[in-house]
A protein has these predicted regions:
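Extracellular and organelle-lumenal recognition/adhesion modules and their flexible linkers in secreted
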Residues: 1-135
Length: 135
């Protein structure tokens, strides 16, 4: 389940944050955002976000952990690579994560994926930012 929480006292940036909750192992609790990215022009994506976790455990399989995943696609919309930040597990307070993700030369589009991704517990995200660096 996805919730938008409005709480300026606990949101690390602004007044709202997104929260995912799931009690059913293996359930795909997530949000996606697609965007154009040309690997001939952009070599690196800078990603930053705030994340908080409560009682996070893997899902039906040990690779079902919450993480932030960017999947890159070529001009035929075939997946060519994944870049990941995480996984996240257990309990932890708000913290900022930053990463530099390599953009494949063949990339023309990408999808950013966040959520529990099959895991159980609760994970929250705030102030997700992406910016590109020229090749």
């Amino acid at each position: 389940q996805l919730n938008i929480i409005e709480d300026p006292d606990t949101a690390p940036a602004g007044t709202r944050f997104v929260q995912f909750q799931n009690e059913q192992p293996g359930r795909g609790c997530r949000a996606l955002q697609g965007f154009a990215v040309d690997g001939r022009k952009i070599g690196i994506l800078r990603l930053s976000f705030f994340v908080r976790g409560k009682n996070i455990r893997y899902g039906l399989q040990r690779d079902q952990w919450p993480q932030v995943i960017v999947t890159f696609y070529n001009h035929d919309r075939q997946a060519i690579s994944n870049e990941k930040v995480g996984p996240f597990f257990g309990n932890f307070a708000w913290r900022q994560e930053k990463a530099r993700l390599a953009v494949p030369l063949q990339a023309r589009e990408a999808i950013l994926r966040i959520g529990l991704l099959g895991a159980t517990g609760e994970i929250s995200f705030d102030q997700i930012e992406l910016s590109g660096e020229a090749s």
